[in-house]
Design a protein with these regions (language model features):
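Alpha-helical transmembrane segments of multi-pass integral membrane proteins
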Residues: 125-231
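Hydrophobic alpha-helical transmembrane segments in multi-pass membrane proteins
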Residues: 4-173, 238-298
Length: 303
């Protein structure tokens, strides 16, 4: 029990607590696996949708019931229905209908931190993950940019809620999520395969569980390493005031980013009637000319 409590605390401080709970990512991975199988077998999309919905129900039944599982299951069912009708799934619409429907049927869910965190994370990913990925893609590899964008987008929308639960900010959540991201998908799929085969093929289930354990070992090592760092968290004001402060800080950073982006676009606009862009828009040119002028000045060459 002591080790479990310490591990949970380290996961929370390192910002990867979501890995210890069933989330929408598990449902997405399972749906992707079923879709690939359906395409390989040339199955009708309606039959594939039925299989996806069935897998969703089995996964939800096998997991410990939770508010995040409820949200993921309902959204997954909407996605399966869209697939059956041949329509592209609309995550934002599905999320809105899910939240409204759940709150109408069960108003008590409005006080659930798990449901709020799950919904906020999905909202952040849907709205901003793509944009952040394109921005980060200019300086990072595509896969790394996507992982970082999803982490940042989810963190931005869940931080105000996290502050209500625990008055501290996880400063190392982005590097922690980047370190474990390559292993999450593999561990999830092999873990689910182990669960599905345990009743009929225990030996093969053991192999899948062993493979999955290597991924979870990486997560445990990252959590213990980063979560034990004194710089892992930053104390913050608690309560509604703390949530409002972090929300204002995020809005301020967002407004500053928009202003800087607009300024850069304005500077990079081509001059009317002239080829190319303004001189100040290319930092490499400025740096090269500065180096050349400095070298000429120091060498005493006035020609």
């Amino acid at each position: 029990a002591t080790y479990a409590n310490i591990l949970e605390d380290r996961f929370r401080k390192s910002g990867i607590m979501h890995l210890m709970a069933v989330s929408g990512g598990h449902f997405v991975l399972l749906a992707g696996l079923v879709r690939r199988l359906g395409r390989w077998l040339l199955m009708d999309r309606r039959l594939t949708a039925v299989m996806i919905a069935s897998m969703y129900v089995l996964l939800a039944a096998a997991m410990f019931p939770g508010d995040s599982v409820t949200r993921a299951l309902i959204m997954g069912m909407m996605g399966a229905a869209s697939h059956a009708m041949g329509r592209r799934s609309q995550a934002l619409s599905a999320l809105c209908w899910t939240v409204v429907g759940v709150l109408v049927v069960s108003p008590g869910m409005s006080t659930s931190y798990g449901f709020a965190l799950s919904s906020a994370a999905v909202l952040g990913i849907v709205l901003f993950a793509g944009r952040l990925s394109r921005v980060l893609g200019h300086v990072l590899p595509h896969s790394l940019a996507e992982m970082m964008a999803m982490t940042i987008a989810a963190q931005l929308f869940t931080l105000p809620i996290q502050v209500l639960m625990e008055p501290e900010l996880p400063l190392l959540s982005v590097p922690a999520n980047l370190l474990v991201a390559p292993f999450v998908g593999l561990s999830t799929i092999t873990g689910l395969m182990s669960l599905a085969l345990a009743w009929c093929m225990p030996w093969l289930a053991g192999v899948f569980a062993w493979v999955s354990s290597w991924g979870t070992l990486v997560m445990e090592r990252v959590a213990m390493w980063l979560g034990s760092n004194e710089m892992a968290t930053l104390p913050w004001k608690d309560g509604v005031v703390g949530a409002a402060l972090i929300l204002l800080a995020e809005l301020g950073i967002g407004a500053l980013s928009v202003l800087v982006t607009r300024q850069v676009k304005r500077v990079r606009q081509p001059e009317a009637g002239l080829p190319g862009m303004r001189f100040g828009s290319v930092w490499r040119v400025r740096l090269t000319l500065w180096i050349e002028e400095s070298r000429r000045l120091l060498s005493g060459d006035s020609s």
